[in-house]
Amino acid sequence: MTKQGFPAPDFDESINRVGTHSSKWDTMERLYGVSAADGIAMWVADMDFRPPNCVQRAIEKMAAHGIYGYYGDDAEYLAAIRWWMETRHGWTVPTEAIFTTHGLVNGTAICVDAFTQPGDGVLLMTPVYHAFARVIRCAGRDVVECPLDVTDGRYTFDTADWQERITPKTRMMILCSPHNPGGRVWSQDELRAVADFCVKNDLILVSDEIHHDLVFPGERHIPMPLAAPDIQDRLVVMTATTKTFNIAGAHSGNVIIPDPKLRERFAARMNALGISANSFGLFMATAAYSPEGAAWVDALTSYLDGNRRLFDEGVNAIPGLRSMPLEATYLAWVDFAGTGMTTAEFIGRVQKGARIAANHGATFGLGGESFLRFNLATPRARVEQAVERLRLAFGDLQ
């Protein structure tokens, strides 16, 4: 049992996802040349764990009823979101500020459409979640890449560099907080610097906070509205149950917009696109944002903390490899620059030698070229196996 009195989840359970239309497991051979028969899928950012029992019960209740109509009367769903943000993050969210989209990427696309024009620039601090650049370019906007600095092995901001790279046509910044793939939890001072930069340059700030619940002991995520309450007239915050509770297939997300004028613009674009809620996602989210869901998240972050410690210790003992310190997320960011190998060489050793599928760092933009991203949200035995395979694949460098 958890300390809150709920059944303890078994994250050590090995669940075979092959043959279930899993993007993570059923496409890795085609994309990475790693067979599911003996390979380890550590790329797509979903977890190999069952969601909390409260989520399972919500789906079972829907199935037992047997009618899957349009969703209506969202008061309970909105109350669950507000309860979660208040109790877990100390953030009081007005009901009228909440919009429901089909997920983070969909929410990003609507923001780009609603708040910029074709030919405008959108600033990204790279390396960063690769879907942002894709959405921006597909919308006919320009990606303004601003590489993050590295200080004492961690990513940091260089606002002076941002100032040199933007143009009068740069209209928006997308912040990843906590950061994917670098695992940073930005400090109050860092978030304040972002806010000040956006005010100075009249930018809309879209803050992707989808990993806000997956923060490790000793770190504290600060929602941007609390870090910089004076910028609410230019702020959009995106969150979701999908990452926290491993229900990405539900395709639902929350877009929280404090300012009424920005809400009007966002709502107009949503209506033009005919976007409405996924009833499965809303039922699951309502169940997840609960005391039982909170107990599950506490158990999850404790388990993931053990996985990251095991992975970091093992990988950092391999000559030439360095895992960036992970403060949040379950996505380890490993630098292979110390091997002296070309990108093709170290990727070949990981995929063909270690038989591991991991995200290629170059897809995350400038600064990611020497990295691979490894998903640690899997049973610990599999993490141990991955570390041992990497040790053998790069053993000749010792």
How would you describe each model-predicted region?
Residues T2-D12, V18, G33-I40, A45-K61, ...:
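PLP-dependent class I/II
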Residues M62, G69-H102:
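Conserved N-terminal alpha-helix of the aminotransferase class I/II PLP-enzyme fold
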Residues T20-Y32:
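Glycine-biased, low-complexity coil/linker segments
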